[in-house]
Regions:
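Conserved GNAT-fold acetyl-CoA-binding loop/helix
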Residues: 42-62
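Short loop/turn motifs at secondary-structure junctions and domain boundaries
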Residues: 66-70
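Residue-level detector of secondary-structure transition/capping positions
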Residues: 35-38, 49, 65
Length: 185
């Protein structure tokens, strides 16, 4: 399978997803949102500690741009009524196996409103229809009830549990990971 191009803007019922670009203005907005939501994010996402400055955010987006060129990851900003409120990406992309993994985060004040569920559905439509993916997956901590609900609402199946597979600085211990997947069929 050959992924030639991807849509830079994806629209849903309430949301617009826009491919992220490395520019100072967006990096500033991104950093400020991460900073404002750091406590909310750090429980489940270890990358938040890497974004300490606007320059870190800009570097992050330059790295993602390179990975996008190599078809390894595609990252979208999540927008509600024109306001940036989070991020969703497809990573661990395998064109050979027509698969990838979805990751996301959203601001604490927008959590619990079905926004991530809609964003995941927009992404799954894109990867199954336009990219001809066969399989997508998402992973989360067994205590991340919000992500478990997203997986269930989007029709993902629980495949299994990886035991103590990553170290969480927040919990200061090794944690399990739930694996959910969805097939095109």
């Amino acid at each position: 399978m050959k992924l030639i191009a991807f849509n830079e803007i994806l629209k849903g019922e309430k949301l617009t997803l826009k491919a992220t670009k490395p520019d100072v203005k967006f990096a500033t907005i991104y950093f400020n949102l991460v900073e404002k939501n750091r406590f909310h994010l750090k429980k489940w996402l270890s990358w938040e500690k890497e974004i300490k400055t606007v320059e870190d955010a800009l570097k992050y987006f330059f790295e993602k741009e390179e990975k996008t060129k190599n078809k390894e990851v595609i990252e979208y900003g999540i927008y509600l009524k024109g306001e940036f409120i989070g991020n969703i990406s497809i990573f661990n992309i395998s064109l050979e196996h027509q698969s990838g993994e979805i990751g996301y985060w959203i601001t604490s004040d927008m959590a619990g409103n079905g926004i991530v569920t809609e964003a995941v559905k927009i992404i799954e439509k894109e990867v199954f229809s336009n990219w001809q993916f066969n399989r997508i997956q998402l992973t989360c901590d067994p205590e991340n009830i919000a992500s478990i609900k997203v997986a269930e609402k989007c029709g993902f199946s629980l495949e299994g549990l990886k035991r103590k597979d990553f170290f969480s600085p927040y919990f200061n211990q090794f944690r399990d990971t739930l694996i959910f997947s969805k097939l095109k069929e």
